[in-house]
Amino acid sequence: WNSFSRVVVYRRQYLPPQLWGGSPVARGENIFFHGMTIDGAAGTAIRSFASPKDIEHLRYDITNVGYYLNRRGKACIIGVGGGKDIQSALFFGHDAVLGIEVNPIFVDLLQNEFREFAGLANRDDVTFVVDDARSFLSQSREQFSVIQMALIDTWAATGAGAFSLSENALYTVEAWQTFLSRLSEGGIFTVSRWYSAEHIGETGRVLSLGVESLLRLKVKKPADHMALITIGNVSTLLICQQPLSEADINRLRQVCEALQYQIVHVPNGLPTEPILRQILSAQSSDQLAEAVAHAELDYSPPTDDNPYFFNMLKLNHLDTALRGQEGVLSGNLRALATLLVLLIVLGVLTVATIGVPLWLAHRPTTLMQTRGFWFGALYFSLIGSAFMFVEIALIQRLNVFTGHPIYSLGILLFTLIASTGMGSFISDH
């Protein structure tokens, strides 16, 4: 346990490896690993790593397709988890690997209890940093040949769909501009997300996010700087500051043919899916906005002012969600319904536990007193609501500077409460 998560590690198992997007040609050899769950739902594993043969199966995971482009130098992993992505970078021959993890429990497990089993902390070419990835990379001037962000989120609240209403500062245009600026010449930023050919959902928004980020970096034709590869329900997007070369494109085609991945997009090969084609054809922010304006889902690129990457439901398309479509729409609809129910419950509880006792204590006898009581209650309720709205927005922004939500919460609460107290004291005098 720590202040914001619960991580459970299970006993060692000897089973076929867990791959996010496994190739059909992957060998079925068993490996030793410890399964892990975070907050009771999100899953990962700590793999045994004593020799390259122990992690050879990682070559068959689509989240690692970017490594086949033979970039060397230092790799950066956003979200260490059980160490799988660090092991992947080492397997594909990177000189050094930096792993950035916001949850200290993972780093502690890899550096102590599972130090020998995972085989990472005892290597000179592996460095761990406990920090928010965006905050760290904003302050660092280090350059990387590959930056990998594979399925970084938590499933803790997806049962009710509530996670679609959570903020995520890693999936905004400003964050991706930071990540892209930390790439060395020819470097690759690789992002893996969930995908479905019928309901493209997150993949469409990731593409939109990549296009807008490149446009803000003065790239004239973003489609030439991106490739999208899929297998099953996982997609991997590759983004470069420089256009992908003909050698890169040929290499991707060879790898995808050998591993039976599907190529959705490479330069000079736009997708057949209309919305993806329109997004990748955009050569300005206005064209991108026009391309996604009439889609049933919200594919607009999230920004720091609207960092809700996972909330893709448009209120003017509620009828589409109500028709019972699966995937993103149904999850977003559950989230909206859950939010409305919670607001109603909280409203009733607030009136029952605060409003009614105050009413009974004062018992206004005239219409004027009754109006004054309820207007006063409404006035102070609005002040409290405004206080919370400001707090939520500032915590999100402060995370980038402090590197951790716990620090942001502590600093912000102290500052707001102290300032409010001083303001009340001064106004009374």
Segments (PLM) and residue ranges:
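Class I S-adenosylmethionine
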Residues: 1-124, 306-409
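Mobile active-site "lid"/loop adjacent to the S-adenosyl-L-methionine
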Residues: 105-106, 113, 123-124, 129-131, ...
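Conserved S-adenosyl-L-methionine
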Residues: 192, 215-232, 265
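Short alpha-helix
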Residues: 204-218
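Flexible, glycine-/basic-rich loop-and-beta segments that form/coincide
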Residues: 222, 234-290
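Periplasmic/ER-lumenal interhelical loops and adjacent helix-loop junctions
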Residues: 263-337
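Transmembrane alpha-helices of Major Facilitator/SLC transporters
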Residues: 345-356, 412-429
